[in-house]
């Protein structure tokens, strides 16, 4: 009997982890295609490419653990609310520990990438731009700058290991007892607290990146698909008129020196500016002519109705997310245990569409896997749309532009770092969208129901299944490791709560801005620093 139970437990684990393995292969393929799509063909470097692919893949693999975690805790129980024969206390704890060790490993690798490997590779290529430095000097300088990131990581680990987690003792309600139980359930070791604090700090940075890029991208992506780009022939006509106008200005300035007199300093500066402007316009002319006559333009024109349909679909998806997030946050504001608990909520008093949909899909395996994968990919694509539209800035200084097929190695590392942090935040975002699903999955537990019969005297007690919630006994429902990891520190949960309101605000502002903006150019912006690039690059198309 024991052997059969162990075999059943192993089978359930194999199912969950096999799907995780398939997701792993799909993630690696996606990251390779994605990075190769944006990296510069002239400046591509093997180390930066591998680093970008690996760091983005690690983040996506970590997010893929979420449905595995939910799948495993849900499969411990039958739909009638009873535990399966093999799911005794030791086996269930072993399954939970398997997921927890997976998180330990992946989160440790993420810390290594964020605080050592990515900064080292970035500074190495920054030093490589200086032709006078040798390999050893580049490595030494890169290590010197990277040391600052290592110190920050060490400080986060130290603070996380010893930061007090004591909740106020002046709360005696049942909900506060449950909050304390959740904080203590994951464990109290200093190593776990240090890792959780460091990852939560990175997730907080990812939340800021999501507010800036993802919230804007959720509105910009669908509206850009619907509006499309400007007509290449019309743009070329406008560009020709601009060339003629600039040539007239140049001719007017040069005519002042026909009699041999030198031009004043102001006219020389103006002449230089007009000549640079003329070079840029002629580059645009050549590229517009190439695009106007290309088969790709005709193919994109044929796909125009499909793009409009996709744009409308993405708007509905964005509205679904926004409505779900608003209702979830409103529920926390009205029914949570308060800011001192990180706005933890038990159960869903205000139902939202995704929180109702995901538990239903989980009953038809693997539909919930598919939906969560779609949600994560949607966040990736909308974040990318936001980054492409806004660029990478340091306060008011624009550091890099992200362009298809023309992104420098340093910009590519920055891009993957931002996406890594945003993907880290998606776990909490999915919890915000579907808190009940992330906490318990599709678990049920048994409650006693009294029934009165008319044909004889007396009452009868009947056990009926009920969806797991805060009212369930502690030994009847298993909380996911993801949920516990997200709520190890209450002050981070409180910050995420306020960040969700900021996310909604930026989405509304971004939607208004995107509606007011006109159509994008058929070309990516052509600048003076593009002179070393081919005039006939298909990567210039704005899709």
Curated annotation (Swiss-Prot):
Protein name: Lysosomal cobalamin transport escort protein LMBD1
Chain positions carrying an annotated carbohydrate: 80, 90, 172, 349, 450, 459
Residues in compartment: Cytoplasmic: 34-52, 124-146, 212-307, 388-410, 510-543
Residues with PTM Phosphothreonine: 240
Keyword Disulfide bond: no
Phosphoserine found at: 531, 534
GO molecular function list: AP-2 adaptor complex binding; clathrin heavy chain binding; cobalamin binding
GO cellular component: clathrin-coated endocytic vesicle; clathrin-coated vesicle; endoplasmic reticulum membrane; lysosomal membrane; plasma membrane
Locations listed in the record: Endoplasmic reticulum membrane; Lysosome membrane; Cell membrane; Cytoplasmic vesicle, Clathrin-coated vesicle
Gene designation: LMBRD1
Motif (WTKF motif): 296-299
Naturally occurring in which organism (per UniProt): Bos taurus
């Amino acid at each position: 009997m024991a052997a059969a139970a162990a075999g059943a437990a192993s089978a359930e684990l194999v199912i969950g982890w096999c799907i995780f393995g398939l997701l792993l292969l799909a993630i690696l393929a996606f990251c390779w295609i994605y990075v190769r799509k944006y990296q510069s063909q002239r400046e591509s470097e093997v180390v930066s490419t591998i680093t970008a692919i690996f760091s983005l893949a690690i983040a996506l693999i970590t997010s893929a653990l979420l449905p595995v975690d939910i799948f495993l805790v849900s499969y411990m129980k039958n739909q009638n609310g009873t535990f399966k024969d093999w799911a005794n206390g030791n086996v269930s704890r072993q399954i939970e520990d398997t997921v927890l060790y997976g998180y330990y490993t992946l989160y440790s690798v993420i810390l290594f990438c964020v605080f050592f490997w990515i900064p080292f590779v970035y500074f190495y290529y920054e030093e490589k731009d200086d032709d006078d430095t040798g390999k050893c000097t580049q490595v030494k300088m890169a290590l010197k700058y990277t040391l600052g990131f290592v110190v920050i990581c060490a400080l986060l680990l130290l603070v996380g290991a010893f930061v007090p987690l004591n909740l106020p003792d002046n709360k005696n309600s049942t909900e506060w007892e449950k909050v304390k139980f959740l904080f203590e359930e994951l464990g109290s070791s200093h190593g776990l607290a240090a890792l959780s604090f460091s990852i939560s700090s990175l997730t907080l940075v990812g939340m800021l990146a999501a507010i800036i890029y993802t919230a804007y991208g959720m509105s910009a992506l669908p509206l850009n698909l619907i509006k499309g780009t400007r007509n290449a022939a019309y743009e070329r006509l406008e560009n020709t008129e601009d060339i003629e106008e600039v040539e007239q200005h140049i001719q007017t300035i040069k005519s002042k020196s026909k009699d041999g007199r030198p031009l004043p300093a102001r006219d020389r500066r103006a002449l230089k500016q007009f000549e640079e402007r003329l070079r840029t316009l002629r580059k645009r002319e050549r590229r517009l002519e190439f695009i106007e006559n290309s088969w790709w333009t005709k193919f994109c024109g044929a796909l125009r109705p499909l793009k409009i349909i996709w744009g409308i679909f993405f708007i509905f998806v964005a509205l679904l997310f926004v409505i779900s997030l608003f209702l979830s946050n409103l529920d926390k504001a009205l029914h949570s245990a308060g800011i001192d608990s990180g706005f933890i909520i038990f159960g869903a008093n205000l139902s939202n569409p995704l929180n109702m949909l995901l538990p239903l899909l989980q009953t038809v395996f693997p539909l919930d896997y598919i939906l969560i994968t779609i949600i994560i990919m949607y966040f990736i694509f909308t974040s990318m749309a936001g980054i492409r539209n806004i660029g990478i800035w340091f306060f008011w200084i624009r550091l890099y532009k992200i362009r298809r097929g023309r992104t420098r190695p340093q910009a590519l590392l920055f891009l993957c770092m931002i996406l890594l942090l945003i993907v880290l935040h998606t776990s909490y975002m999915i919890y915000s969208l579907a808190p009940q699903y992330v906490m318990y999955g599709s678990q049920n537990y048994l409650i006693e129901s009294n029934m009165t019969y008319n044909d004889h005297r007396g009452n009868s007690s009947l056990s009926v299944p009920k969806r797991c919630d805060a009212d369930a006994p502690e030994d009847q429902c298993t909380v996911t490791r993801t949920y516990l990891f997200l709520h190890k520190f209450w002050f981070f949960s409180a910050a995420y709560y306020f960040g969700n309101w900021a996310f909604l605000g930026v989405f509304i502002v971004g939607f208004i801005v995107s509606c007011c903006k006109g159509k994008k150019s058929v070309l990516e912006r052509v600048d003076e620093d593009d002179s070393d690039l081919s005039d006939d690059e298909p990567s210039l198309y704005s899709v």
